[in-house]
Amino acid sequence: MIQPQTYVNVADNSGARKLMCIRVLDASFKQSANIGDTIIAVVKEAIPNMPLKKSDIVRAVIVRSAKGIRRPDGTIIRFDDNAAVVINKEGNPRGTRVFGPVARELREREFTKIVSLAPEVL
């Protein structure tokens, strides 16, 4: 569960290393985001000489969550860290690579480009 002020790792090569969530999108009443939800975040750590700089405001989609989610068959999938992929307004990733595994639920949420770039889908 990602809520405002939560730090998340960045799972792509867009230039950011850490993001801090400042708003959960997709619903006005929602207080927290889970896998597949879109957030607005600020870059807190960045790689030098890359397009994204510290204090840039970006959109990101959550690809891994330590809280985990329950699937319809009863299994629960959870990860070791909270991670996100930086996206543009159209929902396409800003980076060209995705690091680490991502959840299968991203395919149902129409983030097929992120799923195709990921090395492993759980």
Curated annotation (Swiss-Prot):
Which molecular function terms from Gene Ontology are attached? large ribosomal subunit rRNA binding; structural constituent of ribosome
Q: What keywords appear on the UniProt entry? A: Chloroplast, Plastid, Ribonucleoprotein, Ribosomal protein, RNA-binding, rRNA-binding
GO CC terms, sorted: chloroplast; cytosolic large ribosomal subunit
The family database entries (Pfam families) matched by this protein are listed as:
Ribosomal_L14 (PF00238)
GO BP term, pick one: translation
Please verify whether the record's keywords include Chloroplast.
yes
Please classify the protein's predominant subcellular localization into one broad category. plastid
Where can this protein be found?
Plastid, Chloroplast
Q: Does the keyword Repeat apply?
A: no
Q: How does it assemble?
A: Part of the 50S ribosomal subunit.
Which NCBIfam families does the entry mention? rplN_bact (TIGR01067)
User: Function of this protein?
Assistant: Binds to 23S rRNA.
Similarity field? Belongs to the universal ribosomal protein uL14 family.
Protein name listed in UniProt: Large ribosomal subunit protein uL14c
Native source organism of the sequence: Oltmannsiellopsis viridis (Marine flagellate)
Q: What phylogenetic lineage does the species belong to?
A: Eukaryota, Viridiplantae, Chlorophyta, Ulvophyceae, Oltmannsiellopsidales
**What gene codes for this chain?**
rpl14
